[in-house]
Amino acid sequence: MASLPFNTIPNKVPFSVSSKPSSKHHDEQAHSPSSTSYFHRVSSLCKNGEIKEALSLVTEMDFRNLRIGPEIYGEILQGCVYERDLSTGKQIHARILKNGDFYARNEYIETKLVIFYAKCDALEIAEVLFSKLRVRNVFSWAAIIGVKCRIGLCEGALMGFVEMLENEIFPDNFVVPNVCKACGALKWSRFGRGVHGYVVKSGLEDCVFVASSLADMYGKCGVLDDASKVFDEIPDRNAVAWNALMVGYVQNGKNEEAIRLFSDMRKQGVEPTRVTVSTCLSASANMGGVEEGKQSHAIAIVNGMELDNILGTSLLNFYCKVGLIEYAEMVFDRMFEKDVVTWNLIISGYVQQGLVEDAIYMCQLMRLEKLKYDCVTLATLMSAAARTENLKLGKEVQCYCIRHSFESDIVLASTVMDMYAKCGSIVDAKKVFDSTVEKDLILWNTLLAAYAESGLSGEALRLFYGMQLEGVPPNVITWNLIILSLLRNGQVDEAKDMFLQMQSSGIIPNLISWTTMMNGMVQNGCSEEAILFLRKMQESGLRPNAFSITVALSACAHLASLHIGRTIHGYIIRNLQHSSLVSIETSLVDMYAKCGDINKAEKVFGSKLYSELPLSNAMISAYALYGNLKEAIALYRSLEGVGLKPDNITITNVLSACNHAGDINQAIEIFTDIVSKRSMKPCLEHYGLMVDLLASAGETEKALRLIEEMPFKPDARMIQSLVASCNKQRKTELVDYLSRKLLESEPENSGNYVTISNAYAVEGSWDEVVKMREMMKAKGLKKKPGCSWIQITGEEGVHVFVANDKTHTRINEIQMMLALLLYDMGTGSK
């Protein structure tokens, strides 16, 4: 590409009427009283959009044998530009050609024709006319560069900018903004800096539109520091300048900064525009800022902004993303013009809230409005089927896609595959994959995700290597999915090896890569390694997000590592401006409770008392863990008073509290309450807790009756509770029956054999005990030893030791301390 000759100065002579015909005879006729009168009338009509009436006047001039000056044709062409009337403009062009070369080869008319076709996005015709221009001026170049930028031919637009400079035609404040736009679209920051240099040398930096376009360009290129510097140097910032920087912040995920900038803009007294409000709504939606978004809506109302398509769409997007579907409905109902995008947003909003029936109803209304479904509509419906595991709906949508020739759309094909995978039909997902002719990386990754979510690591690996044989190189998403498949299958070491392979292949792990490893470690009981991965992630320069933090806190909870948990809490306070996210607060409450600091858990919860149900659920669970039944019940009873409706997790936690406290009467009251008053259907876990509580209280018959009456098949945990109860009460007649049921339920669980063996030992049935031991040996099962963790103040990491473990490096110290503790306990008991 040619270099930019920046040692130049801009044009000193503006484009003028000197380029019109110079014939004295023609000039006199064109400006005769009659011609002048017609010119003014034509000009007035064109400015009012009355092109046909203007053409009638030109026809009248022809009829009266009046010579038509080039400026009249120029005015009509300009009117066609305003109205985007390509057809009428072509008629004028034909008339010009008919009148001969005197008009057709006139520089003024040639330029006007190029501008007209370019502004109407007729690039081919515009380029042909442009190539025939005898004199190319800044106006014709501006038109060509503008149209190329508009229709996405950004490299061509930049080549035009270079050619202008090489021909010493200096881009002005109309050309430069389009050049900046092209740089931003291509993310060519180095070229953009060159354009910036030209702007400074040509003295255009004081033009607010040029400066704003530079800020916008730097923002799109991700160079926010330079965008901010350009913005700071603008002397008189208008809304366009503020909007440019705000949009840059939002596009680069700096949503908080965008909101702060909006606040500064208002303090400066600059009136916000629709673009301003729409940008703030996007920022609010991205960061879940409900109050910020509502304030933006209020500002739009106060400033009298009409609820047009742009503002209405932004409001819909915001309210749907933050889950305020009722507000989204009100905005939708008040919008006068609704296009397919508008309908898609409200349908998507219903799907996100799990309101599939409402989404389908809106689709029906959309058809009544004579609007056709597009790929987004169908993909949203397919997503609804996937979220609700509604295979029937998914197949109906797929049939619609086939009937209306959408089956070749790769994006839709990937959503169909995802739907089948979520509905548990991976075979059908593979069929869709195989039937798709052109497979892109997204399609390969979709099938890989289906295998990964199901823990089918073997199939995932075959697909992973197969795609590379097909010439499709894996990206970071592909690597993340193959790692996930291994972790879901419990192959921790293989996942770690694959993580290293990803790095050695030149793929840099992203935030999702690290978080996937961390979460997989926690799920597979390797919480200490999860904390190490968090540290390595930070060393690589990545900042943890909310999900990474919740995973790390979960690891601390599993390890009961209060020291590390406090360190992470400190990081949250220092680095996460929106540390009040419910997921983080919930994880903090859970971590502090499981690490032995119930008071700190209460403090975290108390600062946001009753704000969200997940947070309240976590606090009830904490009380249950500590046996604080009174506090758990009080919190449970108070939920509805603050507008929170208990869910299945709430009931599970409060029943667990009753279980820990051994309060069977309170548990029965709550269990009865959810069935009779709340119209909730108890889930299997609720029945399990009640069975466990009844069995622990010696009410074995009642527990058995509850199992027989419940609408679920009993799980192993319930039967274990009954076996333990029978063991305690010496009800030997039930042990044989329950033992068979337990082994049928979970034949590979060593704990079940131990439970049954203990029950037979209490009976004195030693032959059965031996039989259980032999069955375990035949199946290759071993009793898992008890395991404990301890963290020593001032030391890194967590010490792990198991029952009868003599391999620990500090075993002598442990045994000495244990002896001292036993001695103290013995002394205290005397």
From Swiss-Prot:
Keyword terms, alphabetized: Chloroplast, Plastid, Repeat, Transit peptide
Region (Type E(+) motif): 796-826
GO BP annotations, alphabetical order: mRNA modification
The name this protein goes by in its record: Pentatricopeptide repeat-containing protein At5g55740, chloroplastic
Subcellular location: Plastid, Chloroplast
Segments for region (Type E motif): 718-793
First and last residues of the transit peptide: 1-59
NCBIfam families: PPR (TIGR00756)
PPR repeat residue intervals: 69-103, 106-136, 137-171, 172-206, 207-237, 238-272, 273-307, 308-338, 339-373, 374-408, 409-439, 440-474, 475-509, 510-544, 545-575, 581-611, 612-646, 647-682, 683-713
